């Protein structure tokens, strides 16, 4: 086992370290067989993970300190972005020595995740119970059968040092708020990260390649009741079962910088192997820009579109800071939306007219509808001032020609006036701006409201 650094570093470095540690705990190798790794059923049920490297030293008194990351499983089955954490603790007794330990803590309950996200700290053995986690397939049935009475946290560890035992009772896991703010943005909190409100940037891709492997999405044919037949034994012991977990996470690994959108990762899970859709090169945010400028940074202060922070998270988070009421945001984008709508009408009308007799019947109906709308608008607003381009400044009411968008993933809404929707819903766009780093107004399922534009894709 290699030696990992317990000293707190940047969140990008901590995430890469966490990916290496987690892979060593869930993927069998020449030293640890399939019966000496965390069972897939335990990983499947996990509500969250904390991965930490701890240095323990003592002479009469002992102290523990280390750093790592914590992630939470969201309601849709995906994982939150990682939050930087640190661990600290102390003990007493005749202990002499030094020890370096890698820990993986499986958070089995939503309360354990909520306790950390709400208060930024949990105390192992204090406000959450902790016990040694089961190992291998032989322990998986017992863990499944007693799932209702397990400890809130399972602890797994690998040590290198002189201490005979490993104990984390009384240790506190705390949020490294400054590291989170430096990586994600000034006002970012652990609660926002673990609730899924912060999108994972490409810089944390190594960890997600492990989290979205088959080992974390194991589905036995018996429905997870804990008994295994011969076919399931063969499948579990199959060498290909863990092939989607990388063996290394070097910086030269080309796949470690692949785009990392939620939709890409969810599509990857449906295949027999963990692959990325090369056609979808949208960056959630970061050093790369998407082809359709879905998450391109807003141009302010002559920045030239370049990001100052390595992950790009600060620009992303700043562009989504909500200011004012929902009504003021809607008013701010109304005029821009009106111009865009008339631009679309002009383009559609002219292109349809030029096609002449070659138009199909559907296009004829659309052009006629647009023509009638223009005629009515000109009659009813003859005294309305026009811009230099001849466009009206007052928008017409939305019609069947309003743009549509498909939800890339679910949005529960944060305030009154927000438009909640589920992944896959088709949303009618009522008001929009030129940028998807903005809040648009739409309608779905009979409701109207505003929503973050980068949650959807125009169709």
Swiss-Prot record:
The modification Phosphoserine is found at residues 227, 300, 303, 397, 402, 416. Signal peptide: none annotated. Residues 289-300, 372-391 have a biased composition (Polar residues). Residues 400-459 form the SH3 domain. GO terms for molecular function: actin filament binding; identical protein binding; phosphatidylinositol binding. Gene3D superfamilies: SH3 Domains. Its main location: cytoplasm. Residues 351-371 have a biased composition (Basic and acidic residues). GO terms for biological process: actin cortical patch localization; actin filament bundle assembly. Residues 219-403 are annotated as: Disordered. Residues 229-242, 340-350 have a biased composition (Acidic residues). Phosphorylation of Ser-397 is induced 2-fold in response to mating pheromone. GO terms for cellular component: actin cortical patch; cellular bud neck; cytoplasm; mitochondrion. Pfam families: SH3_1 (PF00018), Ysc84 (PF04366). It comes from the Eukaryota. InterPro entries: SH3-like_dom_sf (IPR036028), SH3_domain (IPR001452), SH3_domain_YSC84-like (IPR051702), SYLF_SH3YL1-like (IPR033643), Ysc84_actin-binding (IPR007461). CDD domains: SH3_Ysc84p_like, SYLF_SH3YL1_like. Keywords: Cytoplasm, Phosphoprotein, SH3 domain. Residues 243-262, 393-403 have a biased composition (Low complexity). SUPFAM superfamilies: SH3-domain (SSF50044). Interacts with LAS17. Belongs to the SH3YL1 family. Present with 18000 molecules/cell in log phase SD medium. PANTHER family: SH3 DOMAIN-CONTAINING YSC84-LIKE PROTEIN 1, SH3YL1 PROTEIN. This is LAS seventeen-binding protein 3. It comes from Saccharomyces cerevisiae (strain ATCC 204508 / S288c) (Baker's yeast).
């Amino acid at each position: 086992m290699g030696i990992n650094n317990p000293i707190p570093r940047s969140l990008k470095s901590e995430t890469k370290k966490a990916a290496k540690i987690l892979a060593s705990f869930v993927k069998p190798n020449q030293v640890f067989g399939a019966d000496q790794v965390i069972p897939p059923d335990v990983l499947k049920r996990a509500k969250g993970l904390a991965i930490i490297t701890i240095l323990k030293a003592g002479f009469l008194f002992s102290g523990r300190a280390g750093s790592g990351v914590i992630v939470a499983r969201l309601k849709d089955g995906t994982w939150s972005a990682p939050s930087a954490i640190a661990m600290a603790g102390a003990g007493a007794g005749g202990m002499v020595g030094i020890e370096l330990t890698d820990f993986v803590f499986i958070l089995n309950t939503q309360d354990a995740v909520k306790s950390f996200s709400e208060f930024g700290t949990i105390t192992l053995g204090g406000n959450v119970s902790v016990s040694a986690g089961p190992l291998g397939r032989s322990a998986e049935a017992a863990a499944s059968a007693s799932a209702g009475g397990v400890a809130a946290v399972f602890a797994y560890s690998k040590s290198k040092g002189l201490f005979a035992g490993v104990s984390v009772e009384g240790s506190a896991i705390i949020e490294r708020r400054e590291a989170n703010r430096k990586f994600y943005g000034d006002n970012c909190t652990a609660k926002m990260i673990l609730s899924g409100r912060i999108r994972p940037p490409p810089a944390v891709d190594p960890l997600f390649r492990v989290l979205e492997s088959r080992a974390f999405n194991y589905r036995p044919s018996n429905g997870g009741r804990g008994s295994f037949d011969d076919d399931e034994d063969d499948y579990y012991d199959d060498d290909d079962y863990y092939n989607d977990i990388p063996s290394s996470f070097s910086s030269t690994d080309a796949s470690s910088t692949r785009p990392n959108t939620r939709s890409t990762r969810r599509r990857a899970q449906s295949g027999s192997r963990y692959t990325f859709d090369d056609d979808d090169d949208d960056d959630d945010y970061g050093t790369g820009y998407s082809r359709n400028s879905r998450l391109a940074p807003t141009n302010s202060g002559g920045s030239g579109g370049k990001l100052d922070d390595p992950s790009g998270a600060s620009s992303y988070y700043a562009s989504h800071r909500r200011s004012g009421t929902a009504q003021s945001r809607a008013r701010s984008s109304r005029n821009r939306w009106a111009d865009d709508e008339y631009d679309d009408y002009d383009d559609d009308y002219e292109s349809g007219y030029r096609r002449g007799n070659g138009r199909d019947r559907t296009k004829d109906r659309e052009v006629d509808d647009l023509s009638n709308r223009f005629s009515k608008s000109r009659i009813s607003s003859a005294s309305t001032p026009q811009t230099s381009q001849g466009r009206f400044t007052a928008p017409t009411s939305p019609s069947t020609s309003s743009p549509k968008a498909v939800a890339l993933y679910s949005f529960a809404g944060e305030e009154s006036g927000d438009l909640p929707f589920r992944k896959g819903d088709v949303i009618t766009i009522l008001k929009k701006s030129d940028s998807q780093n903005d809040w648009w107004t739409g309608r779905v399922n009979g409701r109207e409201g505003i929503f973050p534009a980068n949650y959807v894709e125009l169709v």
